[in-house]
């Protein structure tokens, strides 16, 4: 008997579990009628609280507080108002607390929804999409085949790209020089640029093929011999060496070399300008000239400060540590210019003394020449007589 009851109970439980598992997850079960009655009663009370505070559902927290302050000044027992009533104030206070908590919960729920929406949007933006075709990350995605084959193709690609860039730079340079003032010719040249380039390429190719057919390339001195691609150092990358050779042949110089030349020319110009300013003031310096010299020195120091900043930039890009430069000292440069000016003044004084001695010697020789000439005339007259 007991076994039969247990078996029936097991079957009933199994049936209920099976039915529960068959319910789709999106379908919500109906709630208990008692819970629905409780929620309806709470909503009615909440509407009554809103009515007591003279507010609409969906108002903000600030509106709730402002309405409570107005009603408190009106119904508080200690306010001294004609409408003061402690029972009404207790109801208003209870309504205020419930409405305020409801408004805060609604505000937090809205913020949570906004944050969830923003997070979903960000996840959608940064969601990884599987590429349709795989791309190589090395060698700029150029080439196909094995890694060694792709490396060779990439070297050829870089060499071709460098050659094209150099040719484009030379063409633009010549175009700026010869067609700088002719807008019409420049526009026409740009419109026919592609056609002219293709025509030149075809012409060069035809000339090469014609020369090969004639046998002009058969008796070359380097035929059948390996090309001299390297400068004798086997540790240099051949691709880098060839690119540098192409750039050097076309007059290109690295940025650090140009900056080094700029620094050298700038310091020479500053020294010459400072020396010329010192020569203009003369020697010795008057009080006015001393003020002028002080202003010149201040300007020189400011220019040296800018030049030292340029040296910092140069030291950051120079590839060789021994090529780096130290800062120039403005005071040492000023002392050096003053020493050069002192040597210049001494040289001028020596030159003036030599010129004075020479002029005095010529003046002393002139009377002797005149006396000798007169004696010779008198002798000639006596001979004639």
From Swiss-Prot:
Alphabetic keyword roster: Chaperone, Coiled coil
Pfam families reported for this sequence: DJC28_CD, DnaJ
Coiled-coil features, chain-numbered ranges: 261-318
Domain J per the UniProt entry, residue ranges: 48-132
Record's function text: May have a role in protein folding or as a chaperone.
Protein name, UniProt field: DnaJ homolog subfamily C member 28
Species for this entry: Mus musculus (Mouse)
The gene coding this protein: Dnajc28
């Amino acid at each position: 008997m007991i076994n039969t009851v247990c078996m029936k109970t097991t079957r009933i439980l199994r049936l209920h579990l099976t039915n529960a598992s068959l319910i789709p997850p999106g379908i919500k079960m109906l709630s208990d009628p008692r819970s629905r009655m409780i929620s309806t009663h709470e909503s009615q009370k909440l509407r009554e609280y809103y009515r007591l505070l003279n507010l609409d559902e969906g108002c903000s927290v600030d509106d709730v507080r402002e309405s409570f302050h107005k009603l408190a000044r009106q119904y508080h027992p200690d306010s001294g108002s004609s409408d003061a009533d402690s029972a009404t104030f207790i109801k208003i206070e209870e309504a205020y607390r419930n409405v305020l908590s409801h408004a805060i919960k609604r505000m937090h729920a809205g913020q949570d929804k906004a944050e969830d929406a923003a997070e979903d949007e960000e996840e959608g933006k940064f969601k990884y999409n599987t590429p349709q075709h795989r791309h190589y990350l090395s060698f700029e995605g150029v080439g196909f085949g094995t890694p060694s084959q792709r490396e060779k193709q990439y070297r050829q690609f870089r060499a071709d790209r460098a050659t094209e860039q150099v040719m484009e730079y030379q063409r633009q340079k010549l175009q700026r020089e010869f067609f700088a003032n002719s807008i019409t010719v420049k526009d026409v040249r740009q419109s026919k640029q592609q056609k002219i380039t293709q025509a030149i390429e075809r012409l060069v190719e035809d000339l090469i093929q014609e020369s090969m057919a004639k046998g002009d390339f058969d008796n070359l001195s380097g035929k059948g011999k390996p090309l001299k691609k390297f400068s004798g150092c086997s540790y240099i990358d051949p691709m880098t060496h060839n690119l540098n050779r192409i750039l050097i042949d076309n007059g290109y110089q690295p940025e650090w070399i140009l900056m080094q030349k700029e620094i050298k020319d700038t310091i020479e110009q500053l020294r010459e300008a400072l020396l010329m300013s010192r020569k203009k003031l003369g020697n010795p310096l008057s009080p006015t000239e001393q003020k002028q010299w002080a202003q010149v020195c201040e300007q020189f120091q400011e220019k040296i400060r800018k030049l030292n900043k340029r040296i910092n930039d140069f030291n950051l890009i120079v590839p060789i540590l021994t090529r780096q430069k130290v800062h120039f000292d403005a005071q040492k440069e000023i002392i050096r210019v003053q020493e050069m000016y002192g040597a210049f003044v001494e040289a001028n004084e020596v030159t003036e003394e030599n010129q004075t001695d020479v002029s005095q010697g010529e003046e002393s020789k002139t009377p002797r020449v005149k006396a000798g000439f007169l004696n010779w005339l008198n002798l000639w007259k006596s001979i004639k007589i």
